[in-house]
Amino acid sequence: MSHYRQRFLQLALDSNALCFGEFTLKSGRISPYFFNAGHFNSGAKTAALAQCYADAIDAANMNFDLVFGPAYKGIPLATALACEYARRERDLLLAFNRKEVKNHGEGGTLIGAPLNGRKILIIDDVITAGTAIREVLRIIRNAGGTPTGIAVALNRQEIASETNRQSSVQALMAETGIPVVAIATLSDLLAFVEENASLAKFYEPLLAYKTHYGTEASD
């Protein structure tokens, strides 16, 4: 497993962004783990997370010149990532959207650098159903930008349903042709747990969950 994947999973565990137990998801499934990026709630944690994002993005050789953060969780993630790239001596443009239309001041729903003519990387925490990210793609294209990649923290690699064996990420990539990179996946989490003696008791529940709900192909 890549060092940045291990660093991310350890960071998530230490920050309580990654928890093990029994969690009822919005889908109704009982998951043996839960991921909440809201627990990366300090400057140090967010900076460390941004380093992991940048490492994953660089490993995927993504082509972009603007980082876009969808409201709301994507905004601090995109800001932190742009700062991390500046630290690496690569100055990227930054933009994000607001969910409420502003009728005074600068107006509109977009804030930051103009999107027109830009190659845009979208950054978010996870992709669940993919509905929100499709709306972001529409916003970017309407503003004249070209989405060239999507980066998320964790890819759960779960099938949409018993009759639809694709994950939301697989369906999104097949539909749009836009690559999606994740810092880590459910497969990585399984390997991480297997390699850590203190987490050994969570391995079998995770494996059972992946066997039942996991996608057949990697994504």
Swiss-Prot record:
Its EC number is 2.4.2.10. It catalyses: orotidine 5'-phosphate + diphosphate = orotate + 5-phospho-alpha-D-ribose 1-diphosphate. Keywords: Glycosyltransferase, Magnesium, Pyrimidine biosynthesis, Transferase. Transmembrane segments: none annotated. GO terms for biological process: 'de novo' pyrimidine nucleobase biosynthetic process; 'de novo' UMP biosynthetic process; pyrimidine ribonucleoside biosynthetic process. GO terms for cellular component: cytoplasm. Pathway: Pyrimidine metabolism; UMP biosynthesis via de novo pathway; UMP from orotate: step 1/2. Catalyzes the transfer of a ribosyl phosphate group from 5-phosphoribose 1-diphosphate to orotate, leading to the formation of orotidine monophosphate (OMP). Belongs to the purine/pyrimidine phosphoribosyltransferase family. PyrE subfamily. This is Orotate phosphoribosyltransferase. It comes from Xylella fastidiosa (strain 9a5c).
